[in-house]
Each structure stands twice: as structure tokens, then as C-alpha cells.
Amino acid sequence: MIEEIKEHVKRLLDEGTISGFLGLKDQHGTIVPHLYKTSDDLDDGFSIGATEGGAPARYPMASLIMTIATTYENGKVGVLLRGCDERALNELLRWNQIPEAADRIVRVGFACKKELAEAHECRKPFPDECIAGEKTEPVSNASLKELESMDVTGRLNYWLREFDRCIKCYGCRDVCPVCFCNVCTLEEDSLIRTGDLPPENPMFHLTRAVHMAGRCIDCNLCTEVCPAEIPLRTLYKKVAEIVNHG
């Protein structure tokens, strides 16, 4: 699959369709985002996130391309997208975050493997514009169903225990591909007191959860980066469901 994607991107660069490509690069065993400028650059560590003996590396590609596309003045720029990345990009477009650069973004999508889709309970593990990979079936959210089987008191106690582990690192906010506010509510001292660890329970996380309702694209990056391993994605999904459907 990686060779198929690489050759496709090389053609886009060589034909002048794009003048840059935001993808991933293996730098001494660490996968990082990288802006490729020429087709020859792709022969030096090009990656789609696979790591040796570990989970695939994932980044908020949509928010990264938003920054690049609005500042990159050398024509169109391509971007490597999973299904969740495409949903994030569509959400940023819906919120008018990249109006002047929207037509300069060329999507290069690929499908996630079944194992990754199942690990993240992905509802759509492939983008609409998919050039490589086998499209796998959506995965149901078993973790959400498990919580819904508890009574109200059980759910409350569960979340209070989870939130007590929070170290207020803001990792969930910083990695979120659709968190784009210039002024963050979570840094407003009138709402969330600064200096408190753990942050006020449950106000800190419920504030963010309500803020994400109608915007969360279900990528699970928040849970993946959380050093306290709080299942934030499950929280956001349920709050969004309540807000959207009552």
C-alpha cells in the first residue's frame, strides 16, 4: 500500500499538480509529519504511520494542513488522510476555518487496516477519496454500550474516578484536529481555576465535552495521547449524542 501511495504522490509532484505534500516521515525510527517538496524526497523515509512493534503513529493532519495551506503560497498542496483526517478536514471547512485555501488542498486518502479500526472502534475507517488500502467495515462502539448498561450512579462514579487522574496537561485539546478557538474556555480563570490539580472535577472535562458536541469527528486521538488513559472519546460521543438528540 505504501508504494502505491508514494507513486501517486510522486506523479502529483512531477506533473505540477501540487508543489508540496504533507505526509509522514520515518526519522531514525520516529514517525513525524513532514512537508515533501519533490518526488525524490519521498524516497527518504516516506511513511504512512506504520511503526515496528507498536501502534501506527497518528497526527492531526487536518489541523496541520490548515496551517500550511493558509500560509503556503506556492500553489496547491497535498495531504495524506485517513478516514478520521478527512472527517476533520470537512469539519474545518464547515466551520469556515480555511476559506481562502480550501481549493488548494489535494487529498490523498488511504484506508486503515482492520486491526486499527477495531482498536479505535472507528465508525468509518476510510476516506471517501481513497486511493489505497482495503475498505473495512465500521466498528460499533462497545465501550459506550458498556457504560450505558450502568445506572446513573454507576456512570457518575465511573467518570469521577477517571477525571481524578487528570493532570491538566491539555493534551486532549492540543491534539484535537477540530479545536481551533483563539481563546480557550479551559484557560478562563473565571470558569476553570488555574493551578488546581487535578482540575475541578467534573467541570474541566464536561466543559470541553459540551464544547466538542457537534464538532467531534471521533478520531480517538484525545484518548490516545492522554497520559492518564482517560477514555475521553467515549465521553465526547455520549455528550454529543445527548446534545444533538436530547
Language-model-derived ranges and their functions:
Residues 143-163, 181-246:
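Ferredoxin-type iron-sulfur electron-transfer modules in oxidoreductases and energy-metabolism complexes
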